[in-house]
């Protein structure tokens, strides 16, 4: 993997998106089974290795997201493709709504070493996902946002681009307007926490769920409705200040 002067810019330079290879083995095995691929022990690992060794991968995606185990296995094994041969930014999944030893006030004691290890292994960005359900209390969402903001600040200090993934899940009967409002508020809460923590938004890449009505909503949204509602929510939240979405 090359040394990218502006990894956040590289992640969003072309409209190719990120390739997520960080799913649990059970998810990968299920996908391969549905595709009719013969399964054996180690099939999921072999699938990831094949993808990483694909010629021209840098022309197809803007970045690759790995789970921590795969990142460090690929780095430490001579039988798998070295990350320096992958000519796209490689990221690592760090947050999955598991607070571990971190308190909800945003303390990230103990995670700095993880960031340093991932950086040394070849990662240039890291992702943390924050999920806002329809019934998530405002105080709880703010606490999660503070935690993510503290993590993002540590990433910037440690040389990783923070990729903050905000997923807003609407209520079952929410229409597209209600869903857009909830989505915008979730993104705004996270961005406000980042600013409060002193993180420059132009150093952050945002992942965002799209705005769709709840599964039991009475209204039907077209693809254009979904696109407009999603963009409206992002603009209202101030997402234009980010490195990219």
What positions do the PLM features span?
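Structured alpha-helical segments in the cores of large, soluble enzyme domains
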Residues: 108-125, 144-160, 186-197, 226-236
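Short, ordered loop/turn segments at secondary-structure junctions
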Residues: 24, 69, 130-133, 166-169, ...
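Alpha/beta catalytic barrel-like cores
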Residues: 1-121, 134, 219, 223, ...
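Alpha-helix N-cap and loop-to-helix initiation/capping positions
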Residues: 35-39, 106-110, 139-147, 174-186, ...
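Active-site capping/gating regions of soluble enzymes
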Residues: 174-245
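Conserved, mostly hydrophobic/aromatic
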Residues: 40, 128, 165, 206
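Hydrophobic beta-strand scaffold residues
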Residues: 90, 162-163
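Glycine- and Gly-Pro-enriched alpha-helical subdomains that act as flexible
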Residues: 159, 165, 170-171, 175-178
């Amino acid at each position: 993997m090359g040394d990218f002067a502006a990894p956040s810019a590289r992640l969003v330079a072309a409209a190719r998106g990120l390739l997520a290879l960080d799913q649990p083995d059970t998810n990968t095995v299920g996908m391969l089974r549905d595709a009719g691929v013969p399964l054996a022990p180690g099939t999921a690992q072999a699938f990831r290795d094949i993808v990483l060794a694909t010629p021209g991968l840098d022309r197809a995606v803007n970045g690759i997201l790995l789970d921590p185990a795969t990142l460090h296995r690929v780095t430490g094994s001579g039988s798998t493709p070295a990350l320096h041969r992958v000519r796209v930014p490689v990221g690592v999944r760090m947050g999955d709504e598991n607070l571990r030893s971190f308190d909800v006030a945003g303390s990230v004691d103990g995670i700095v070493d993880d960031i340093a290890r991932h950086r040394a292994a070849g990662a240039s960005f890291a992702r943390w996902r924050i999920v806002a359900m329809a019934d998530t209390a405002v105080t709880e969402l703010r606490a999660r946002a503070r935690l993510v903001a503290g993590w993002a600040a540590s990433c910037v200090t440690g040389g990783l681009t923070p990729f903050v993934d905000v997923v807003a899940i609407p209520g079952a009967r929410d229409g597209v307007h209600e869903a857009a409002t909830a989505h915008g508020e979730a993104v705004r809460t996270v961005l406000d926490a980042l600013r409060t923590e002193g993180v420059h938004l132009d150093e952050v890449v945002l992942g965002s769920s799209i705005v769709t009505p709840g599964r039991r909503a009475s209204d039907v949204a077209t693809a254009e409705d979904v696109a407009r509602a999603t963009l409206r929510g992002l603009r209202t939240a101030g997402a234009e200040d980010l490195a990219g979405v």
